[in-house]
UniProtKB/Swiss-Prot annotation:
Belongs to the DNA mismatch repair MutS family. The lineage of its organism: Bacteria, Pseudomonadati, Pseudomonadota, Gammaproteobacteria, Vibrionales. One of its GO terms (biological process) is mismatch repair. The keyword ATP-binding applies. CDD domains: ABC_MutS1. The gene is mutS. ATP binds at G615, P616, N617, M618, G619, G620, K621, S622. This is DNA mismatch repair protein MutS. Transmembrane segments: none annotated. It holds the Pfam family MutS_III. Keywords: ATP-binding, DNA damage, DNA repair, DNA-binding, Nucleotide-binding.
């Protein structure tokens, strides 16, 4: 919007342009009566994003003004749509009195709604965190800060590589991300909504320290343990400045900053989070994820805490055993069943407290807070039976807070209106002065009923009624048929089609008295409402501790219920390297299968650090690998696991290289994606890592693929010594255990019955003898005639009777690996086919290609 001067514009438009110049990069909702209106480029953009009409509102400076508008009462729904698309909005309200204003009514921006700083219930995902983050980069090092404004949770970290930074962005998934104008690795910001460019000076260290000390009321940051994290502090300083600018109020619920140390967590990179489908499936949904199975929490704040645990598994055994002990007690005592309904009635206190801190809480927020506090005595009765130390600590923080509960019981009506604007929120008896003015206003109703009856009888007019509207105030209405009976002192105020309306001095006097008492009562109520915040805010820290304790009790109670219902066992955590699972099951697959799940063991230790896994397509190799990783992850969350028994050793990272698809947006092929993920593993895995490798090398020629798979497996086994599950269709790799120590072959078998195949899904020692590719192709619906032809050709290939076209020229491949027998072009092409990855159309095209090679 290029506006050089505002002088040629109307006074109202001059006011709009001034406010817009103060908020140039975001949409401005400009209040006009019962509408919020947008002009110029904002109007065009809003009409596209919200699918609303784009019109014109007169002209200014000789040009028509593009305009779009939305009703003020529907603003929350439109804000939700914009926030979901990564947009920010400045809300401009009328703050002046139209009756006393000369020129346009005074307006100002009262709040700025951004994706990462929303606190309104209607704009937030209930069971997921809503984070705002800031990222700082300097000479290959990163600083990263995140804030959940709905809880005050403020964290900082310093990822030391782009790969680690990308993993943090994937884990935290901020809805809004601040970065400096000179930020270099911009590819990290691609495919994201809510990116916000900020001035470089906002990331300066001295400015950041000053901002943070001002927020926390401290002289330095030593007490928080973050004083040496200079890059992280640069990001945190920008973040806290931005939040203050948008909220336009103090932030009393943000009282500390926490350093996230990588050494404390089991690190999951972006590919691993995606492949394990922790909280999001491969299609981007929530169905059939680990969180869907484990999250039966009673409160939304408990649900959010559980997801944080799942995305940040910890390595500290003391913390994990503390959680496991608590779950064990709740499970064995059956107390989880008593706690669930009590917790459900408490609700999402965490976010109510954030709105209280920002003084944006609505009447029903405080009513819900009151209702939550009323549940604590019953919950306290249940928690008295706790014996485990951590449960007792949580129970102590979740004790009833009688003073706050009593205050809210006295102050707030049982079912208050949505907003304070029209009053009727504070309970009768809370304030004597308010009651007196309310009584005066309410007594008016009785007076009017009495006046109506007296006037009707005095003048013998049975259609006479006393009424009120906002335009004409109080009036006496008489039907047209009886209007001739109206006495002389009745002054006509309004003529309707079927009635006449009058005013009398007595009624006018009463009107002034009533309106004055109502406005006086409303003014007192609004003042008392603000004073109520002043009484509650000193208790904010205690209330937040209570909310945090209830969240964790909810998660632990939920995990106890899941362990009991789903027949999970307690994992044993050891300091040694290794994984030993008996009767392991995939937590998600076993719940969605109609047939019984086949449980399988796994044993990994320094003498058996790599398993070469072979077997048919659809035989269960990927499921077996994923269930191992998920059980290890669940153990490091501190919850029970789907197994008969599980012994889980020290883990620093979990890597997965399972499946791949073209990354067309970045110009990367399937094979390029596969090799990038493999390179990441080979560079970053350690002897304490768990590595899952599935079908390495299948995206290129047989020789290249086998060479890469062999070399990768050998490197992991001999140089890194990582605990590795290596699934492959290259049967040549089953020779590896004969060449190197610490490797073993296992396979998943299948049984053929004529033309049918039955997958056993049971893991057995040793290598598989065939992959049953044609049987799987038949199951996939490849035409029987094609399968028949393929069987014939397979027999030819296996017997070496491969016809060579007269026109073909045999080219001997140089530098062939000694372990690979010389094979024909058709044989190579067949080995490269993986029916699991083919659509019916692709399968048909592949068969045509095979035929052309004969």
């Amino acid at each position: 919007m290029a506006i050089k001067s505002t002088e040629k514009h109307t006074p109202m438009m001059q006011q709009y342009l001034r406010l817009k110049s103060e908020n140039p990069d975001i949409l401005l909702f400009y209040r006009m009566g019962d509408f919020y209106e947008l002009f110029y480029d904002d109007a065009k953009r809003a009409s596209q994003l919200l699918e609303i009409s784009l019109t014109k509102r007169g002209s200014s400076a000789g040009e028509p003004i593009p305009m779009a508008g939305i009703p003020y009462h529907a603003v929350e729904g439109y804000l939700a749509k914009l926030v979901q698309q990564g947009e920010s909005v400045a809300i401009c309200e009328q703050v002046g009195d139209p009756a006393t204003s000369k020129g346009p009514v005074e307006r100002k921006v009262v709040r700025i709604v951004t994706p990462g700083t929303v606190t309104d219930e209607a704009l937030l995902p209930e069971r997921f965190d809503n984070l705002i983050a800031a990222i700082y980069h300097h000479k290959g090092q990163f600083g990263y800060a995140t804030l959940d404004i709905t809880s005050g949770r403020f964290k900082v970290s310093e990822p030391n590589t782009e790969e680690a930074m990308l993993a943090e962005l994937q884990r935290t998934a901020p809805t809004e991300l601040l970065f400096s104008e000179d930020f270099e690795p911009v590819h990290l910001l691609e495919k994201r909504n809510g990116n916000r460019r900020r001035p470089v000076w906002e990331f300066e260290l001295d400015t950041a320290k000053q901002q943070l000390n001002n927020q926390f009321g401290t002289r330095d940051l030593v007490g928080f343990g973050v004083e040496k994290a200079e890059f992280g502090l640069c990001a945190a300083g920008c973040l806290i400045q931005y939040v203050k600018d948008t909220q336009r109020t103090t932030l009393p619920h943000i009282r500390s900053i926490i350093m996230d140390h990588q050494d404390d967590s089991v690190i999951l990179d972006a590919a691993t989070r995606r492949n394990l489908e922790i909280t999001q499936n491969l299609a981007g949904g929530f169905n059939h994820t680990l969180a869907e199975i484990l999250d039966h929490t009673s409160t939304a704040m408990g649900s959010r805490l559980l997801k944080r645990w799942l995305h940040q598994p910890v390595r500290t055994h003391d913390v994990l055993n503390q959680r496991l002990d608590a779950i064990g007690e709740l499970k064995e005592s059956g107390l989880f069943a008593d706690m669930a309904p009590q917790l459900k009635n408490i609700g999402d206190v965490e976010r109510i407290l954030a709105r209280l801190a920002l003084r944006s809480a609505r009447p029903r927020d405080l009513a819900r807070l009151r209702n939550a506090l009323q549940q604590l005595p019953e919950l306290s009765q249940t928690t008295q039976e706790f014996q485990q130390d951590h449960l007792l600590t949580l129970a102590a923080s979740a004790q009833p807070i009688d003073s706050i509960c009593e205050l809210l019981e006295r102050a707030i009506k049982e079912n208050p209106p949505v907003v304070i604007r029209d009053g009727g929120v504070l309970a009768d008896g809370y304030n004597e002065e308010l009651d007196q003015w309310r009584d005066l206003a309410n007594g008016a109703t009785q007076y009017l009923e009495k006046l109506e009856q007296e006037e009707r009888e005095r003048h013998d007019i049975d259609t006479l009624k006393v009424g009120y509207n906002n335009v004409h105030g109080f009036y006496i209405q008489i039907s047209k048929g009886q209007s001739h009976k109206a006495p002389a002192h009745y002054v006509r105020r309004q003529t309707l089609k079927n009635a006449e309306r009058y005013i009398i001095p007595e009624l006018k006097e009463h009107e002034d008295k009533v309106l004055n008492s109502k406005s006086k009562a409303l003014a007192i109520e609004k003042r008392l409402w603000e004073e109520l915040f002043d009484q509650l805010l000193p208790h904010l820290e205690q209330l937040q501790s209570m909310a945090n304790a209830i969240s964790e009790l909810d998660v632990l109670s939920n995990l106890a219920e899941r362990a009991d219902t789903l027949n999970y066992c307690r994992p044993v955590l050891t300091k040694e390297t290794g994984i030993n699972i008996e009767g392991g099951r995939h937590p998600v697959v076993e719940q969605v299968m109609s047939d019984p799940f086949i449980a399988n063991p796994i044993k990994l230790n320094p003498d058996r650090k790599m398993l070469i896994i072979t077997g048919p397509n659809m035989g269960g190799k990927s499921t077996y690998m994923r269930q191992t990783a998920l059980i290890a992850l669940m153990a490091h969350v501190g919850c029970y696991v789907p197994a008969d028994s599980a012994e889980i050793g020290t883990l620093d990272r979990i890597f997965t290289r399972i499946g791949a698809s073209d990354d067309l947006a970045s110009g990367r092929s399937t094979f390029m994606v596969e090799m990038t993920e493999t390179a990441n593993i080979l560079h970053n895995a350690t002897k304490h890592s768990l590595v899952l490798m599935d079908e390495i090398g299948r995206g290129t020629s047989t020789y290249d693929g086998l060479s890469l798979a062999w070399a990768s497996a050998e490197w992991l086994a001999t140089k890194i010594n990582a605990m590795t599950l290596f699934a492959t269709h290259y049967f040549e790799l089953t020779e590896l255990p004969n060449l190197f120590t610490g490797l073993a072959n296992v396979h998943l078998d299948a049984v053929e019955h004529g033309d049918e195949i039955a997958f056993m899904h049971a893991v057995q020692e040793g290598a598989a003898n065939k992959s049953y590719g044609l049987a799987v192709a038949s199951l996939a619906g490849v035409p029987k005639s094609v399968i028949k032809k393929a069987k014939q050709k397979l027999q030819h290939l296996e017997s070496g009777q491969v016809p060579v076209p007269a026109t073909s020229t045999t080219v001997k491949e140089e530098h062939q690996l000694s372990l690979i027998p010389e094979i024909s072009e058709v044989e190579e092409a067949l080995a490269h086919v993986n029916p699991d990855d083919l659509t019916p159309r692709q399968a048909l095209e592949e068969l045509y290609r095979l035929k052309a090679l004969l």
